[in-house]
Design a protein with these regions (language model features):
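Acidic/histidine-rich, surface-exposed loop or edge segments in extracytoplasmic proteins
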Residues: 43-56, 93-98, 114-117, 141-144
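Short helix- or helix-capping micro-motifs
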Residues: 137-139, 167
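N-terminal post-signal-peptidase region of extra-cytosolic proteins
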Residues: 98-102, 254
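Flexible glycine/proline-enriched surface loops and loop-helix/loop-strand junctions
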Residues: 96-98, 132-133, 142-147, 173-178, ...
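Penicillin-recognizing serine hydrolase domain
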Residues: 43-84, 89-91, 151-327
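Short, well-structured active-site flanking segments
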Residues: 119-137, 160, 205-208
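Active-site SXXK
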Residues: 92, 102-126, 139, 268
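Secretory targeting and sorting signals
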Residues: 1-42
Length: 327
């Protein structure tokens, strides 16, 4: 993997020769985020150049070791700069890689916009209007930019900031003006967001969580690449992706998702940049995702194949002006 940006100290090496650290006996996965989402910070270690992938499971240390080694192998030799977060409550498993590194969000920020909208309807004790529901569906299932821009303006920065605060997503910084795709995100905060949707909490009620997950389960086929690669066919896939080229660090290619069913659920977050093409970044994510799914599920599981390139690949999901780093 490429030399990676530390959020504070410039670049530190997480090259393919870096050590894989797997600690089995430290830190349980029961820590809670604000509002009751479980496990997002459990056992988290600070990113360091000597650690490629850190997986922890007090209950299943062998599993943690296999997943860490598999992710390490999947990312070795890739030019992509990668941040990754995995959480499986049932397996008491957490994995970390560059979790505090900031990336331009591209379209994954649309889940934050949706969460803010749903939180606002709860505060106002009302349902979504027909217009809000229409725009929310377009924004999530088709990654429609006009819908995202309309809802970004509709909820406003104040409510977006309030939602981030309630969700304890303190590392997320909203993009300037109407450029939601330049919001700064981290794998740490994106995992918190996925857990807000999966587990009961005081930020979003059950109906809102179900609504958001249902939309993420209906993303159109051409946008179901990334972390769904290799997922069990009998689990429900909830996904949102982002893809954006900028003048520096190439394509930002991100995939966030959770996988639910049969009384279990787990989340995978992969954020990347320094990708020469969109397809290259998608491949980086899918190689890691296939390893994770295969290790978290029993032998004999029928897995979904990785996505093949679609005609729409290579089209930026937001137009950024050169003055803000666009190309």
């Amino acid at each position: 993997m490429r030399w990676c940006r530390s959020p504070r100290w410039g670049r530190v090496s997480v090259a393919a020769t870096a050590a894989v650290l797997c600690a089995g006996a430290t830190a349980a996965a029961g820590a809670t985020a604000a509002g009751g989402a479980t496990g997002a910070r459990a056992g988290e270690q600070p990113d360091a150049g000597s650690i490629a992938v850190n997986c922890i499971s007090a209950a299943h240390p062998g599993l943690a070791s296999r997943i860490a080694q598999g992710i390490h192998a999947a990312l070795s030799g890739r030019s992509s700069t990668v941040a990754l977060r995995v959480y499986d409550k049932s397996e008491d498993l957490n994995c970390y890689l560059n979790t505090r590194m900031r990336f331009d969000s591209a379209s994954v920020v649309k889940v934050i916009i949706l969460g803010t909208l749903l939180r606002e309807t709860e505060t106002q004790h009302r349902h979504l209007t027909a217009s809000e529901a229409y725009l929310a569906r377009l924004m999530i299932t088709q990654s429609d930019n006009n819908a995202a821009s309309a809802l970004w303006a509709h909820v406003g920065r104040g409510r977006l900031e309030y939602f981030l605060g309630r969700a304890a997503m303190s590392e997320t910084q909203l993009g300037p003006g109407g450029y939601w795709g330049l919001t700064q995100i981290t794998a740490h905060d994106e995992l918190l967001l996925m857990q807000l949707l999966q587990y009961p909490n005081t930020v979003l009620g059950n109906a809102s969580r179900s609504y958001a997950l249902n939309l993420m389960a209906q993303v159109i086929p051409s946008q179901r690449w990334g972390v769904p690669a290799g997922a069990p066919a009998d689990l429900t896939v909830h996904v949102k992706n982002g893809w954006l080229p900028l003048a520096t660090h190439g394509w930002r290619i991100h995939s966030i998702g959770c996988f639910t069913g049969h009384h279990r659920g787990y989340s995978i977050i992969v954020l990347t940049e320094d990708n020469p093409t969109m397809a290259y970044g998608v491949t980086t994510i899918q190689q890691a995702a296939e390893v994770i799914h295969s290790q978290l599920n029993p032998a004999g599981t029928v897995f979904l194949p990785p996505s093949a390139p679609a005609p729409s690949w290579g089209q930026p999901d937001e137009q950024i002006p050169p003055s803000l780093g666009g190309r």
